[in-house]
């Protein structure tokens, strides 16, 4: 009896588990818990018979003086715990590293007429894994130096073959931070741990079953292979799981009402869907939306990673529509062209919300009247989940922007509130509408209306922060969004601000606007607590990530630099993590 193996866990496997749990705790969802439980169960039950065979055939052994004593099918309990803790740690690391990635954007629809390399890559992987399995079987049959290596490969390769066959596109298509990194980090770490354990004799490989080759002093090649293969199994299992979820939640035509907690049968059905059946137009819309969000709003892109899958898709598509509509108007060469774009957008909404018109009519209108890079955003707008009025009001906000060509439309604080409500409050309102559509609550319609109205107010607060940050940027394009009566009270004229948007008086006005923003924010944030639990934390992140810009601007001595982010990426990440932690406290 001894505690050497138990001490390995105390020193090297449990501390990472605690750290990863604390890091991911604010983001942990019921679906994540299901993933972890599912993968741990599969990993432990699949490994126990294999490891038991190794021990009973003396390929692998644990000296009596290094283990406490209790066993399961001849496997020391410390080893059984290792199966659990390795899977848990690698799974959590994968969840952390993959969280920022909007994975459905990496699905690829098949084209019957295209000579895609995907099928050849799939076949190459299958042939390699089948060949490895055959080679491993021969090594086991020989019962010589390659026996342990053969047993590792003949056990793992068929499972990896199944994972590859079902999810090869996802495995090949996702960023390396979702695939290579979650395999490499725990593998390297366990190589170091194993080096220490083998040197101390915590576990022993029978000399006649190994090649005697070391990756480095203290790490035998078989052990290096074992940790690489097992971490690959875990991560590929996660990728197959997420591939299935992406299909379930991305294509409403294929899965009109996907369950929030899918069964294994749901996952298998999703993985068996041919890529030729994927909705290419919807995929293109999501891919375009992700690119726009990355370029235009880093704060919201960070916040979007915290939203559940189906809601995240709808929010991305909504943002994409709003962004494209805004760009069409802002980038117009003349005021007349901008008015034409607004008119066309009004016509598009008429078609979309008209009961008498088919979707084909609106699609034909978009194809005929909008540039190619704007079409997917319009056609993929989840209009069937949204009321028309907020979208109409958004266009009225663009019309207020055009009024700057003649005179400022923002003469009083009332005008400022109206403008902010139209261009930002409406967007926040639509976000809340989508949340209630996806996650029905027990509220009455009146109570839901109050929450939607509070969302509108919160959007106004965020727009105030945006205006406060961009005073100089806006002045350079000939616009001042501060009320004219505020300027008069400070002894300034509109033209003076256009020429010189800096100085003590302008800083005073910036602080005044921020005070208003935080006052509105304080009045509206209580409504967030009544949102469905699935969206409550993510909405907090979206709000706090932006309000952190306001807090930064209010810091004494802070200098605004036009065109530069006021909050660093890491500070936004910390704000998001703290916000989510508070939401579960």
Swiss-Prot record:
The answer, when asked if Endoplasmic reticulum is one of the entry's keywords, is no
Pfam families listed in its UniProt record = SQS_PSY
* Pathway it works in: Carotenoid biosynthesis; beta-carotene biosynthesis; Carotenoid biosynthesis; phytoene biosynthesis; all-trans-phytoene from geranylgeranyl diphosphate: step 1/1
Tell whether Transferase is among the UniProt keywords: yes
Region listing for Lycopene beta-cyclase, in residue ranges: 1-243
Q: Which GO terms describe its cellular component?
A: membrane
- Tell me what this protein is called: Bifunctional lycopene cyclase/phytoene synthase
What is the organism field in this record?
Phaeosphaeria nodorum (strain SN15 / ATCC MYA-4574 / FGSC 10173) (Glume blotch fungus)
* Taxonomic lineage: Eukaryota, Fungi, Dikarya, Ascomycota, Pezizomycotina
């Amino acid at each position: 009896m001894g505690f050497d193996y138990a001490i390995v866990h105390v020193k090297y496997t449990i501390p990472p588990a605690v750290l990863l749990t604390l890091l991911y705790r604010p983001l942990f969802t019921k679906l994540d818990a299901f993933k972890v439980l599912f993968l741990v169960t599969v990993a432990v039950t699949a490994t126990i018979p294999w490891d038991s065979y190794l021990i009973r055939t003396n390929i692998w052994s644990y000296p009596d003086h290094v283990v406490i004593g209790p066993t399961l099918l001849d496997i020391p309990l410390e080893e059984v715990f290792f199966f659990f803790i390795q899977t848990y740690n690698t799974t959590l690391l994968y969840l952390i590293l993959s969280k920022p990635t909007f994975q459905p954007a990496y699905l690829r629809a098949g084209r019957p007429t295209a000579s895609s390399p995907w099928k050849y890559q799939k076949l190459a992987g299958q042939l390699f894994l089948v060949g490895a399995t055959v080679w491993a079987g021969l090594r086991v049959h020989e019962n010589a130096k390659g026996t342990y290596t053969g047993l590792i490969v003949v056990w793992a390769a068929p499972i990896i073959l199944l994972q590859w066959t079902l999810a090869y596109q996802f495995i090949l298509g996702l960023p390396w931070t979702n695939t290579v990194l979650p395999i490499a980090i725990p593998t390297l770490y366990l190589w170091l741990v194993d080096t220490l354990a083998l040197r101390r004799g915590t576990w022993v490989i029978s000399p006649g079953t190994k090649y005697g080759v070391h990756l480095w002093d203290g790490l035998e090649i078989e052990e290096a292979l074992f940790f690489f293969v097992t971490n690959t199994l875990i991560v590929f299992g996660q990728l197959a799981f997420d591939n299935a979820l992406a299909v379930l939640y991305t294509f409403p035509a294929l899965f009109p009402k996907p369950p929030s907690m899918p069964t294994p049968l749901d996952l298998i059905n999703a993985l068996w869907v041919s890529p030729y059946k994927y909705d290419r137009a919807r995929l293109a819309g999501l891919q375009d939306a992700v690119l726009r969000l990355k370029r235009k709003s880093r704060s919201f892109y960070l916040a979007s990673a915290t939203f559940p899958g189906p809601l995240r898709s709808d929010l991305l598509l909504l943002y994409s529509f709003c962004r494209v509509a805004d760009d069409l108007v802002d980038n117009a060469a003349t005021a007349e062209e901008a008015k034409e774009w607004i008119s066309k957008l009004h016509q598009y909404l008429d078609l979309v919300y008209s009961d008498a018109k088919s979707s084909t009519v609106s699609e034909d209108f978009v194809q005929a009247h909008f540039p190619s890079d704007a079409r997917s955003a319009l056609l993929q707008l989840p209009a069937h989940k949204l009321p028309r009025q907020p979208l109409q009001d958004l266009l009225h906000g663009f019309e207020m922007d055009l009024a700057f060509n003649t005179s400022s439309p923002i003469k009083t604080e009332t005008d400022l509130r109206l403008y902010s409500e139209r261009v930002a409050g409406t967007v926040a309102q639509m976000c809340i509408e989508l949340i209630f559509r996806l996650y029905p609550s027990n509220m009455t319609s009146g109570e839901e209306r109050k929450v939607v109205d509070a969302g509108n107010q919160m959007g106004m607060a965020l727009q105030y922060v945006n205006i406060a940050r961009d005073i100089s940027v806006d002045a350079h394009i000939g616009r001042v969004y501060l009320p004219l009566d505020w300027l008069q009270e400070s002894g300034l004229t509109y033209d003076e601000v256009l020429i010189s948007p800096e100085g003590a008086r302008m800083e005073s006005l910036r602080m005044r606007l921020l005070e208003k923003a935080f006052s509105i924010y304080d009045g509206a944030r209580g409504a967030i607590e009544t949102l469905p639990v699935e969206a409550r934390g993510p909405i907090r992140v979206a709000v706090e990530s932006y309000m952190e810009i306001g807090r930064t601007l209010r810091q004494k001595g802070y200098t605004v630099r036009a065109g530069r982010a006021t909050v660093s990426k890491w500070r936004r990440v910390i704000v998001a993590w703290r916000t989510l932690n508070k939401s579960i406290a």
